[in-house]
């Protein structure tokens, strides 16, 4: 009986490990002097280091820094564009990698360089503006 429990435990551990080897790799890029589309999503296998393209955005300006919500349902991005910089919120479908723009807010400063989110807020740090801005979440 003890061997049966050990075998079941090993099967369970193996299946849990197999389930956790693939992740979404979400990559922001600069777009102003190249053909980049903005944000790219890849399937990443942590065991083999292989990655495969899943999806991308269209015409998102310089999403140079990203953060993903704790529940993996939203991606937030800075859109670095000098004094006209913005922060964008996207609905995120983790299975397909699809990102749908929900809204965009002025970054309240130039050249955003860092972005973080918690359960209630999205916070951006602006490099040239020398400030931070806090945006409350509205279901996005």
Locate the predicted segments by residue.
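A short beta-strand motif characteristic of beta-propeller blades
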Residues: 52-58, 100-106
């Amino acid at each position: 009986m003890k061997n049966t429990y050990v075998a079941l435990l090993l099967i369970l551990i193996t299946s849990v490990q197999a389930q956790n080897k693939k992740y979404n790799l979400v990559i922001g890029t600069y777009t102003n002097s190249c053909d980049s589309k903005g944000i790219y999503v890849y399937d990443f296998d942590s065991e083999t280091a292989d990655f495969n393209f899943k999806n991308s955005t269209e015409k998102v300006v310089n999403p140079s820094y990203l953060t993903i919500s704790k529940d993996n349902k939203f991606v937030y991005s800075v859109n670095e564009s000098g004094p006209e910089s913005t922060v964008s919120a996207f609905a995120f479908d983790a299975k397909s990698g699809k990102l749908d723009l929900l809204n965009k807010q002025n970054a309240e400063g130039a050249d955003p360089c860092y972005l973080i989110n918690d359960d209630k807020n999205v916070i951006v740090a602006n490099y040239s503006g020398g400030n931070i801005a806090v945006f409350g979440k509205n279901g996005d």
